[in-house]
Amino acid sequence: MTTAVTAAVSFPSTKTTSLSARSSSVISPDKISYKKVPLYYRNVSATGKMGPIRAQIASDVEAPPPAPAKVEKHSKKMEEGITVNKFKPKTPYVGRCLLNTKITGDDAPGETWHMVFSHEGEIPYREGQSVGVIPDGEDKNGKPHKLRLYSIASSALGDFGDAKSVSLCVKRLIYTNDAGETIKGVCSNFLCDLKPGAEVKLTGPVGKEMLMPKDPNATIIMLGTGTGIAPFRSFLWKMFFEKHDDYKFNGLAWLFLGVPTSSSLLYKEEFEKMKEKAPDNFRLDFAVSREQTNEKGEKMYIQTRMAQYAVELWEMLKKDNTYFYMCGLKGMEKGIDDIMVSLAAAEGIDWIEYKRQLKKAEQWNVEVY
């Protein structure tokens, strides 16, 4: 049985052949057995009829060794029974908007909204998956708009604890192009403008990259910028705001959240409540680029904040039960790599190869845009 702990959801305002290759395919005589079989040719007699001849030819060649048996992969993540692509673009699930709230301050550089949609238990997603949204209307060619994918911001139980809703965290996209025209993102504006009761077409769920690890004692390091916080909110709700018969988190969750201004901090109050609730299991660090600097006077981007704990994080990352997740703006990825390259090099380790091994072990998970 799974229940949700009562917790207020507060939101602030690549064939070639060669002679050598052919030579290597000659069969050794000691591996050939012979028997008589008829071989036909065209008789040169006046009758023109076919006549038989007999010849000694190879008929039994040693069989090649069998191919090695495939080893079944066992994921370290919560993949058992996972549902993928239940609803597709041509047959979406039509849900309804239950809640739509702006969660950035009025002076924040851009609007971000938290929205909740009903699915009545028909979209059995997992923490770390995404859903597609098909906005109403048509494109400039008169065709229905294509879906956009959004990371899910709620646990599998949803914000209301009944496993009948799904939440998204969406930033309204508005920008000025080179011609000086104001451009509005089709789907983001559609979503941010939704009123409670309005219908919305949903697809999915999709994705396995960002699923949580099974190990309840794992160390989970999460780096998110802006709306990249979405999958981590879903993780953290499961860890700290819910009670499950088959899962109790006893490890360490460490969240780094990067935003431009303090009024852009998303779900700040929720995360602070989690820290109060489980101080030994949850660490929280913000990076506010336009308001904070490091000791060198450099702007506090998420990689800058992470650099302050570089040695500690590196030691954690060398352990088999540490999982690293990154979601948000692609720009932060290089900054993180730069830090890790020097730390790894100090121990004679090639970071690029080491990261490849981490990815193979499902310990390095990235979803950036």
From Swiss-Prot:
Membrane topology reported for the UniProt record: Peripheral membrane protein
Which region of this protein is its transit peptide? 1-55
Q: Name one Pfam family in it.
A: NAD_binding_1
Residue ranges crossing the lipid bilayer per the database entry:
none
Q: Where is the FAD-binding FR-type domain?
A: 90-212
Binding positions for NADP(+) per the UniProt entry: 151, 171, 227, 259-260, 289-290, 299-301, 328-329, 367
Q: What is its EC number?
A: 1.18.1.2
Q: Which of this chain's residues are annotated to bind FAD?
A: 148-151, 169-171, 175, 186-188, 227
Q: Which cofactor does it need?
A: FAD
Q: Which CDD domains match?
A: CYPOR_like_FNR (cd06208)
* Localisation per UniProt entry: Plastid, Chloroplast stroma; Plastid, Chloroplast thylakoid membrane
What's an example GO BP annotation here? photosynthesis
Q: Which UniProt keywords apply?
A: Chloroplast, Electron transport, FAD, Flavoprotein, Membrane, NADP, Oxidoreductase, Photosynthesis, Plastid, Thylakoid, Transit peptide, Transport
Q: Which PROSITE patterns match?
A: FAD_FR
Cited function: May play a key role in regulating the relative amounts of cyclic and non-cyclic electron flow to meet the demands of the plant for ATP and reducing power.
**Family of this protein:** Belongs to the ferredoxin--NADP reductase type 1 family.
Q: What is the protein's given name?
A: Ferredoxin--NADP reductase, chloroplastic
Taxonomically, what lineage is the organism? Answer: Eukaryota, Viridiplantae, Streptophyta, Embryophyta, Tracheophyta
